[in-house]
Swiss-Prot record:
GO cellular component, one term: chloroplast
Any Pfam family: DUF1257
Species whose genome carries this gene: Porphyra purpurea
InterPro entries tied to this protein: Uncharacterised_Ycf35
Protein name: Uncharacterized protein ycf35
C-alpha cells in the first residue's frame, strides 16, 4: 500500500534548495516532472530526486513554500525522513546566511563543524 505524503517545509528559495540538495550529495533535476503516486496517478513536482526503486521524490511549490512529495513506504535515501529534513534545513539555512551576509558585504572567514552537528560560521567585512 502506498503512503504518498506532502510534507510542508520552510523552504522558499529554489536556488538555496538546489545548493542544499547538492551539499547532501543528491542528484536533482528542475525540469517539470511527474512523481508516480500509488498505482494509477501522478503528481507534478518542480525538483525531482530519482531513487533506484523508481518511486522518486520531489519538491513542489505551494503558494509560498516548497513541499516535499514522497511515498514514505518507498523512501530510499541514506537517512530517515526526519534526519533528511534536519540536514536539508541546516544546509538551506547555511546557504541562506552565506547569501545574506554577502549582500551586506561580508565574506566567509571560517566554518567549523561542531561535535553536536551544528556549524559555527565566522564572517568578516573589511572597512576601508
Amino acid at each position: 500500500m502506498s503512503h504518498f505524503t506532502k510534507i510542508q517545509t520552510t523552504i522558499k528559495d529554489l536556488n538555496l534548495l538546489k545548493h542544499a540538495l547538492t551539499d547532501l550529495g543528491l542528484i536533482w533535476n528542475t525540469n517539470s516532472f511527474n512523481v508516480k503516486v500509488g498505482e494509477n496517478s501522478q503528481h507534478k513536482v518542480d525538483i525531482l530526486i530519482k531513487q533506484g526503486n523508481l518511486s522518486h521524490i520531489g519538491f513542489v511549490w505551494n503558494d509560498n513554500q516548497y513541499h516535499l512529495v514522497a511515498d514514505l513506504q518507498l523512501w530510499e535515501q541514506p537517512w530517515s525522513l526526519e534526519v533528511f529534513l534536519d540536514k536539508l534545513s541546516q544546509k538551506y539555512a547555511y546557504h541562506s546566511i552565506i547569501e545574506e551576509t554577502k549582500k551586506q558585504g561580508f565574506e566567509k572567514a571560517e566554518q567549523v563543524y561542531q561535535k553536536d552537528g551544528s556549524i559555527k560560521l565566522i564572517v568578516q567585512r573589511w572597512n576601508y
